[in-house]
Each structure stands twice: as C-alpha cells, then as structure tokens.
C-alpha cells in the first residue's frame, strides 16, 4: 500500500521547487495524492477494511489542509498544482 522509494523520488523530482526541495507543499500534496490513490485501489478489493479507511480519511484531511495553505499563500502555485495532479478543485 505504501509507495516505493523510487516512486517517491520521482514525485519529489517532478514537483520540487528547487534542487533539494523535499518538503514544500507541492511535494507533500503530490506524495499524499499518490498514497490516497493507492489506498483507493486497495478498497476496491477490501471493502470492509475500516482501519485503513480511517487512515485514508486522515490523509485526505492532511492534503486538504496543505492545499488550503497553498491557496492562501500563492494562488498561481495552487492552480498549477491541482492541474498537474488532476484534482477536482
């Protein structure tokens, strides 16, 4: 269910704002989005896994908080990120 180190490095490389950037809001949202999509796939076969469902809700909430912060800080970066990730908003 977790993402591999290679996939995480790839996400960091594509969404980083600088050379050594691993903690910007864009990178964190991209990693959370990947984890959320992995869990969503997991629930297609394991419908009664309520323990993991709680974790999914926490991840979604954390991503929402980061997106809200980014939207307040820099609207252009926010719009660019949601277009890149294909999020609804």
From Swiss-Prot:
GO molecular function, one term: rRNA binding
UniProt-listed CDD domains: Ribosomal_S15p_S13e (cd00353)
Cross-referenced Gene3D superfamilies: 6.10.250.3130, S15/NS1, RNA-binding
Gene Ontology terms: biological process: translation
Gene Ontology CC annotations of this record: cytosolic small ribosomal subunit
Record's keyword terms, sorted: Ribonucleoprotein, Ribosomal protein, RNA-binding, rRNA-binding
Record carries keyword Ribonucleoprotein: yes
The protein's assembly and partners: Part of the 30S ribosomal subunit. Forms a bridge to the 50S subunit in the 70S ribosome, contacting the 23S rRNA.
Protein name: Small ribosomal subunit protein uS15
Native organism: Phenylobacterium zucineum (strain HLK1)
Gene name linked to the record: rpsO
């Amino acid at each position: 269910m977790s993402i591999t180190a290679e996939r995480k490095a790839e996400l960091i490389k594509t969404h980083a704002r600088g050379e050594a950037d691993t903690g910007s809001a864009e990178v964190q949202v991209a990693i959370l989005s990947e984890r959320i999509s992995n869990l969503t796939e997991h629930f297609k076969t394991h419908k009664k896994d309520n323990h993991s469902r709680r974790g999914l809700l926490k991840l979604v909430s954390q991503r929402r908080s980061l997106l809200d912060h980014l939207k307040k800080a820099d609207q252009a970066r926010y719009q660019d990120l949601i277009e890149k990730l294909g999020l609804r908003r």
